[in-house]
């Protein structure tokens, strides 16, 4: 692992961290560690870092407190090797990374971009010495206060999960109530205790600590239902290049939710929900995972949570973008229903941090997280069943559909109808290429403009369906690119002169070539 942007003071920290990590790894291996020496090393790091102005507005101080508290806990437990493995080592790795990123990288735009391109993944890989304890799934439940909700969540996981192949990590993320004491009553659970809440670092600690082939994140304001984990794993194991699988939950945006079911009938509702929709898995451009199961090997290839998103808003949009550009797919499993109370932990501060998180996303990626195509329209979805496409092989053209959620939902629908789909896409914005190209058979950047590109791109092809989120396109050109009987599904468009109106819903309309 390299640290390209080391300052003089950070170089002074590096040998101290090497000694700390060496001692921690000795303890994790079941050997005796020198706790006094480790405390002294932390003191030396504090002497170097405390005056650094760039570290005043990050989680350096909080994470230093977490490391010191973990060290104290180690002196008071008989389970030293285990605690060092899943708490002290991940805490130290995150402390070092917090100091490096905010102290040496974050202030400079060029350094940030190089860091994200060349260092982020290697700096966030899982480095876990507990190889003898491999499990299929690590389930992690973070909680910051709200013990009454946390108990319902944990009890539902214990009730509805076969834990013989699972590791259960319970993260007390700076709670001031009795959360930590409750967590310690759960048999066979591993409790990671943050004395200080350190935002996004919590996700990285959980990832570094896990020993499962899959990592299941369960928010403490949810209740899981019978079969939740096996059903989500079924999707991950069957779908090609699947990074994550997420259930339907109420009080969730991004067209991922439905109206809540009364808790008294939750289990029966979820069982019936699954039987009626079994295997209905929808590839989506972005996912908001109040519950999400991830393929750990793929997370290792792209990194998980990014500390850049200090407000904890848009971190999931960031993960989704990086997944798309790796060619990994995220699935909303519309056959799995779990309950969500609705951002019990995060809801209070949400209004204050949303705009800040969106700006951080723009600064990192140069595109708006809520830009064109970030979430498909319910009106568009309502028009899809109005199409009559008798052919089994569908040639599909997407025109200026941005991030691509509408593209993926049309693909989902056509595949549900038993169609073989060949998808082509064109856009005036080259920046969307990485979001869409891995999932289509052809891409064209319309540097000549969309109207001209509709004439020139994929010139040898005619299409059964054209989808466009760009208004004002020529109906004549669109009709020319259609096969007889083909459709245009368009937003804010009037194509009456050249095509027959087959349906209209809100801003969307469906047109057919006769």
Regions found by a protein language model. Give the residues of each.
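Conserved donor nucleotide-binding strand/loop of the catalytic core
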Residues: 180-199, 209
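A short, conserved alpha-helix in the catalytic core of glycosyltransferases
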Residues: 227-231, 285-303, 308-336
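Conserved donor NDP-sugar-binding/catalytic core segment of glycosyltransferases
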Residues: 226-261
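N-proximal low-complexity "stem/linker" segments adjacent to membrane-targeting elements
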Residues: 100-156
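Short aromatic/hydrophobic "clamp" motif used to bind/position activated sugar donors
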Residues: 215
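A recurrent flexible, glycine/aromatic-enriched loop bordering the glycosyltransferase active site
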Residues: 200-201, 208, 251-252, 256, ...
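A conserved acidic beta->alpha catalytic loop
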Residues: 172-180, 402-403
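Short, acidic, metal-binding catalytic loop of nucleotide-sugar glycosyltransferases
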Residues: 155-165, 413-416
């Amino acid at each position: 692992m390299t640290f390209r942007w080391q300052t003089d003071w950070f170089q002074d920290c590096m040998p101290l961290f090497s000694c700390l990590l060496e001692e921690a790894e000795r303890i994790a291996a079941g050997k005796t560690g020198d706790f006094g020496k480790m405390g002294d090393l932390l003191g030396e790091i504090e002497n170097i870092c405390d005056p650094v102005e760039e570290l005043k507005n990050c989680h350096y101080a909080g994470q230093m407190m977490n490391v010191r508290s973990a060290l104290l806990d180690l002196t008071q437990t008989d389970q030293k090797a285990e605690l060092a493995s899943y708490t002290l080592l991940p805490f130290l790795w995150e402390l070092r990374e917090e100091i490096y990123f905010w102290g040496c990288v974050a202030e400079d735009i060029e350094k940030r971009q190089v860091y994200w391109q060349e260092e982020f993944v290697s700096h966030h890989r899982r480095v876990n010495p507990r190889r003898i304890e491999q499990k299929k799934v690590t389930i992690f439940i973070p909680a910051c206060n709200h013990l009454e909700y946390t108990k319902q969540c944990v009890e539902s996981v214990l009730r509805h999960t076969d834990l013989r192949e699972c590791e259960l990590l319970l993260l007390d993320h700076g709670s001031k109530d009795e959360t930590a004491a409750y967590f310690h009553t759960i048999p066979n659970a591993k409790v990671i205790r943050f004395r200080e809440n350190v935002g996004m670092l919590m996700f990285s600690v959980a990832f570094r600590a896990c020993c499962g082939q899959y990592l299941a994140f369960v928010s403490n304001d949810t209740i899981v239902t019978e079969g939740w984990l096996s059903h989500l794993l079924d999707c991950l194991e069957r779908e090609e290049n699947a990074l994550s699988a997420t259930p339907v939950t109420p009080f969730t945006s991004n067209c991922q939710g439905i109206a809540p079911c009364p808790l008294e009938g939750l289990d029966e509702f979820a069982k019936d929900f699954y039987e009626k929709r079994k295997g209905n898995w929808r590839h989506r451009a972005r996912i908001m995972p109040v519950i999400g199961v991830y393929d750990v090997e793929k997370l290792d290839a792209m990194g998980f949570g990014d500390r850049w998103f200090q407000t904890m808003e848009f971190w999931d949009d960031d993960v989704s973008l990086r997944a798309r550009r790796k060619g990994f797919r995220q699935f909303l499993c519309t056959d799995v229903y779990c309950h969500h109370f609705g951002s019990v932990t995060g809801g209070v501060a949400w209004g204050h941090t949303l705009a800040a998180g969106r700006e951080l996303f723009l600064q990192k990626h140069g595109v708006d997280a809520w830009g064109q195509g970030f979430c498909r329209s319910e009106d568009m979805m309502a028009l899809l069943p109005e199409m009559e496409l008798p052919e089994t092989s569908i040639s599909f053209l997407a025109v200026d559909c941005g991030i691509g959620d509408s593209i993926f939902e049309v693909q989902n629908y056509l595949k549900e109808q038993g169609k073989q789909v060949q998808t082509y896409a064109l856009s005036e914005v080259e920046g969307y290429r990485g979001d869409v190209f891995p999932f289509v058979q052809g891409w064209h950047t319309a540097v000549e403009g969309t109207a001209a590109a509709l004439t020139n791109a994929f010139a040898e092809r005619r299409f059964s369906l054209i989808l466009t989120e760009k208004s004002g396109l020529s109906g004549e050109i669109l009709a020319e690119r259609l096969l007889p009987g083909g459709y245009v599904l368009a937003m804010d468009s009037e194509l009456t002169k050249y095509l027959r109106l087959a349906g209209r819903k809100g801003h969307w309309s469906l047109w057919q070539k006769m």
